[in-house]
């Protein structure tokens, strides 16, 4: 078969995913097949009849549809594909997490970076701090209260949002 999910160590056992192989999604990891996350394999199964024409795009140029960012599993012992919608999947219900700094005050006139001390992890525990978007600003030359809202979305399209009040004193 051209398309298939990442291998499992046991037949019909959703918690037996070869997690190290899952983390190779998006790389040259097999002998010519296209390995997929469960959700992608299921979409093809549900939407593409047998005999559907497949065009393989292999080039150093920008791809016409873009290349999806694969999710990685941080804990290789869990053994589940994070995109599997089975009810027992421990990734179900997990969302990204944003951690904010404890200090929320700035001295008048000090430089302030609204991203300092702000971190984020995805639904699988991977660092996605570089994907954080901030809404708002701090004008450190003017006393007052400033609200910054941080948002992040992971490769599973799950989101988190946290707000922080910064005092310029």
Regions of interest found by a model, annotated:
Residues 126-155, 159-168:
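Serine/threonine-rich, repeat-prone extracellular segments and beta-strand-based repeat modules
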Residues 92-126:
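Solvent-exposed, low-complexity, repeat-rich "mucin-like" stalks and linkers
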Residues 57, 121, 151-153:
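A generic structural motif
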Residues 1-94:
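Exported/periplasmic cell-wall-interacting domains
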